Design a protein with these regions (language model features):
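Conserved metal-phosphate-binding beta-hairpin within the catalytic cores
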Residues: 25, 34, 89-122, 130
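Aromatic/hydrophobic pocket-lining residues that form π-stacking "cages" and hydrophobic walls in ligand
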Residues: 10, 85, 126
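Gly/Ser/Thr-rich helix-start
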Residues: 30, 120, 135
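Active-site "cap" helix and flanking loop/linker of ATP-utilizing ligase/carboxylase catalytic domains
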Residues: 46-98, 129-148
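Short secondary-structure capping/turn micro-motifs that flank functional sites
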Residues: 30-31, 105-106, 146-147
Length: 148
């Protein structure tokens, strides 16, 4: 993530490694994630970044005590996230499980990626979404294996 002031400097640095550089718009709103099991969305989650780190990197994701993953209270956002994630899952011909990640700004929601083999550690988002949906870890594993 680069500020406008440091953009040219960062672009020059990136071009030291490759002549081709990917530049993405930064969204300043909340980040969301929706885990899908057999094409059906589980409880969508909002990711509240560690305010000290300011960016959801490896450290913030796995080691920070300040990063939070919470249920979304706004039902209209939950509905939109579920609808979009189901379309993405189907469009990409996913089968058993996946996780769709979103960024937002104002009313805009943007899909940033789909994880066709999402993380599955004790701190991962997929098992947490399943737990909030009433599916315990062992049952989740069984459901995934049964569908393969």
């Amino acid at each position: 993530k680069v500020s406008d002031k440091k953009f040219n400097e960062a672009l020059k640095e990136a071009k030291n490694y490759s002549s081709e550089v990917i530049i993405e718009k930064s969204f300043n709103g909340p980040e969301y994630t929706v885990a899908l099991l057999k094409g059906k969305p589980l409880t969508p989650l909002q990711i509240l970044h560690d305010p000290i780190r300011g960016f959801y990197d490896y450290e913030a994701k796995y080691n920070s005590q300040n990063t939070q993953k919470i249920k979304i209270e706004d039902e209209s956002i939950v509905k939109r996230l579920k609808e979009i994630s189901e379309k993405v899952f189907d469009c990409l011909n996913c089968k058993t499980w996946a996780r769709v990640d979103f960024v937002s700004e104002g009313e805009k929601l943007a899909v940033i990626e789909i994880n066709s083999v999402p993380g599955f550690t004790a701190k991962s988002l997929f098992p947490l979404a399943a737990k909030y949906s009433g599916i315990e870890y062992k049952e989740l594993i069984s459901l995934i294996i049964e569908d393969c």
